[in-house]
């Protein structure tokens, strides 16, 4: 077991928390991290790019000029790829972009990403976050207290509760702040839906609550 300090939103230390080494302090597997991010970015591709071949563009039914005696290069159709408005050779067509990883590799990637941030001292645990109403100024005050005004920050919360929803609304105007509520209320079992490797490693600091730490340990431990 390792320990991590717990802070309040005023950046005052209020205690420590035991965290599992097998989740937050493993030797990161960079290959699996790469595979996970590659999978995420690949699966975001729409695959809708499409061009027309010479058989699909309009026109080109007859030979534009005689084969001989014009002094011009021979041509059989004005929709040849050599012509303006002609068909495209080897252009993109709609296709399915999809990659997947097995559950074991996905969990290893999440653990690796969390461990990277923990070892960099870029993992911050808050005792609680209470937002009675959305207010961007309050989020900016928290960032200021921790010296993160110009830092890419990821906030992780465990449940779709009013206080966390209000925080998410408060932060939506801040371009360097992302908030993930890692929960799917439609599932009966506990889950960390929304928690992903790309956002973990794309942020410079990760801020989460004690509840979120416990939930991560319970679900992916």
Curated annotation (Swiss-Prot):
It holds the Pfam family Ribosomal_L4. Keywords: Ribonucleoprotein, Ribosomal protein, RNA-binding, rRNA-binding. SUPFAM superfamilies: Ribosomal protein L4. Residues 46-74 are annotated as: Disordered. It comes from the Bacteria. The keyword Ribonucleoprotein applies. One of its GO terms (molecular function) is rRNA binding. One of its GO terms (biological process) is translation. The keyword rRNA-binding applies. GO terms for cellular component: ribonucleoprotein complex; ribosome. NCBIfam families: rplD_bact. One of the primary rRNA binding proteins, this protein initially binds near the 5'-end of the 23S rRNA. It is important during the early stages of 50S assembly. It makes multiple contacts with different domains of the 23S rRNA in the assembled 50S subunit and ribosome. HAMAP family: Ribosomal_uL4_B (MF_01328_B). Belongs to the universal ribosomal protein uL4 family. This is Large ribosomal subunit protein uL4.
């Amino acid at each position: 077991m390792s320990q991590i300090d717990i802070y309040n939103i005023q950046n005052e230390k209020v205690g420590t928390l035991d965290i599992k080494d097998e989740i937050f302090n493993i030797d990161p597997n960079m290959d699996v991290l790469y595979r996970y991010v590659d999978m995420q970015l690949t699966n975001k591709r729409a695959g809708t790019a499409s061009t027309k071949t010479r058989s699909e563009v309009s026109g080109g039914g007859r030979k534009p000029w005689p084969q001989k005696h014009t002094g011009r290069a021979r041509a059989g159709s004005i929709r040849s790829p050599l012509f303006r408005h002609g068909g495209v050779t080897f252009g993109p067509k709609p296709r399915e972009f999809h990659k997947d990883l097995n559950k074991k590799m996905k969990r290893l990637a999440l653990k690796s990403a969390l461990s990277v941030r923990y070892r960099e001292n870029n993992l911050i645990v808050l005792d609680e976050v209470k937002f009675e109403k959305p207010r961007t100024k309050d989020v900016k005050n928290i960032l200021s207290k921790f010296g993160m005004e110009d830092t890419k920050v990821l906030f992780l919360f465990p449940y779709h509760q009013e206080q966390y929803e209000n925080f998410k609304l408060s932060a939506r105007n801040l371009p360097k702040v992302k908030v993930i509520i890692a929960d799917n209320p439609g599932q009966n079992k506990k889950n960390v839906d929304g928690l992903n490797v790309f956002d973990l490693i794309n942020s410079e600091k990760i801020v989460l609550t004690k509840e979120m730490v416990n939930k991560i340990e319970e679900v992916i431990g």
